[in-house]
Regions:
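N-terminal regions that are enriched for targeting/export leaders
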Residues: 2-54, 60
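Non-cytosolic beta-sandwich-type ligand-binding/adhesion modules
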Residues: 71-77, 146, 209-212
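Short loop/turn segments immediately following beta-strands, especially the blade-tip
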Residues: 146-153, 215
Length: 223
């Protein structure tokens, strides 16, 4: 971890995980599906394969079974049936993800696991004016890559590659969950889920990524 908050959060999550593991899940524990040591599990994130190992990251709230601050849990498998929980490598330890490391995706390539995710921030609302749909929320797209090769348990300094101000003006604050892939031409592509400000169906925002550190928005980005 790159800062004191991250280091303290890592210790706290590890302590909760250790205590829960010691207690065990009993007769109701999952035997086939991924199950974290404690708390609440939601969206699978960053599913990828590297060196014969499958990686499944997931939304994990270790402190509350009804949800709460979201981290990324991490489990690995060689057969997609037996999973080992190996920790929580991505924690909300920066101003741009302080209310949760939300969903995203990963690619295993060039000796690294590369991740894009949504950093969730709910702004303080002393006056009660935010509805947290059109106002009061940030959802920046954040990039990290593993610093321990393809193990994917330790990650680099976080970097915002798309700030909330970069999204189209007709979208609400609900823009999240980047899915990235690489085309045959070598270009990276990314899709984000989004909600328009006017009533209507949810849409996708499509971004063309020239590289992980510089994303460009084409004119016909919305479908």
């Amino acid at each position: 971890m790159s800062n004191a908050l991250g280091r303290d959060l890592a210790k706290l999550v590890a302590a909760v995980d250790a205590a829960a593991t010691e207690c065990g899940h009993g007769a109701y524990g999952q035997r086939f599906h991924i199950m974290p040591p404690a708390g609440w599990l939601n969206d699978p994130n960053g599913l990828c394969q590297a060196g014969g190992v499958f990686h499944a990251y997931f939304q994990y709230a270790p402190f509350d079974v009804e949800g709460g601050v979201k981290v990324w849990g991490h489990a690995t498998s060689r057969d997609l049936m037996t999973w080992d929980y190996v920790g929580a490598p991505l924690l909300p330890d920066e101003p741009f993800d302080c209310h949760g490391v939300y969903s995203g995706s990963a690619l295993a390539e060039d000796g690294h696991i590369r991740v894009l995710y949504t950093g969730n921030v709910k702004l303080s609302d002393a006056d009660g004016t935010y509805d947290y749909v059109n106002t009061g929320r940030r959802a920046d797209t954040v990039y990290v890559e593993s610093v321990d090769g393809l193990a994917g348990r330790e990650f680099s300094q976080k970097r915002v590659v798309l700030a909330s101000e970069d999204y189209p003006d007709d979208l609400t604050c609900h823009v999240r969950d980047p899915k990235v892939w690489r085309d045959a031409d070598g270009r990276y592509r990314m899709v984000l889920g989004a909600r328009r400000r006017v009533d209507g169906p949810h849409i996708e925002s499509r971004f063309c990524a020239v590289s992980y550190t510089h994303l460009t928005l084409p004119t016909n980005s919305l479908v």
